[in-house]
């Protein structure tokens, strides 16, 4: 309740990211993608329409969040490693990565490549030491899902860490030797890498 609008939206995007980028079948409540609120009423079954009605104007007010969820759905549909439903498949292809407090990070593999997924629930950026050195295509970071026409990349140098933005999810794809991906400008490659 004390967060400003930008922080509340970042938290909502992170929560949506956890749902859509986790294994299994995702499900959200109607309006979650546009920060539906019931005015703080945690038990609104008998509160009436003034509390329970869907405020469709919020789809415009929070269009960035709506677009982000659409991007997550497209990303999930494109990457089989994010849609596994069998424990055996998940166990065989998902590896947890070393990460900071308040961070969950894992690597998932499928026939299309190797992906790194990071959820940073901290109010500050966090260094993720478990991300191996190499070049990565950035599929999502800092509240943005990148499309095919907006390709980004980042290089993590040996001895450095990837820095995940505060209150955000990151999806990286290990770049193949054949990938030609523009590197984000302004990145000091000798230190910790941050996208955004």
Which positions does each model-derived feature cover?
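Short aromatic-acidic-glycine turn motif
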Residues: 134-148
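Loop/helix patches that line or flank the sugar-binding groove of alpha-linked glycan CAZymes
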Residues: 1-136
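Short, solvent-exposed loop/edge segments of extracellular or virion-exposed proteins
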Residues: 183-195
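C-terminal beta-strand-rich structural cap/linker in extracellular carbohydrate-active enzymes
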Residues: 151-180
């Amino acid at each position: 309740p004390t967060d400003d609008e930008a922080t509340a939206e970042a938290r909502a995007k992170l929560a949506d990211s956890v749902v859509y980028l986790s294994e299994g079948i995702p499900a959200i409540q109607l309006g979650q993608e546009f920060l539906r609120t019931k005015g703080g009423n945690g038990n609104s079954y008998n509160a009436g329409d003034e509390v329970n009605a869907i405020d469709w104007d919020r789809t415009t007010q929070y269009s960035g969040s709506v677009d982000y969820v659409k991007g997550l759905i497209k990303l999930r549909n494109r990457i089989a490693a994010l849609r596994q439903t069998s424990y055996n498949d998940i166990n065989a292809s998902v590896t947890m990565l070393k990460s900071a407090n308040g961070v969950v990070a894992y690597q998932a593999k499928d026939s299309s490549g190797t992906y790194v997924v990071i959820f940073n629930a901290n109010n500050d950026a966090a260094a993720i030491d478990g991300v191996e050195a190499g070049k990565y295509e950035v599929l999502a970071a800092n509240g943005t899902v990148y499309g095919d026409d907006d390709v980004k990349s980042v290089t993590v140098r040996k001895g450095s860490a990837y820095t995940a933005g505060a209150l955000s999810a990151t999806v990286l794809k290990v770049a193949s030797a054949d990938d030609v991906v523009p590197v984000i400008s302004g990145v000091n490659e000798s230190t910790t890498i941050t996208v955004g």
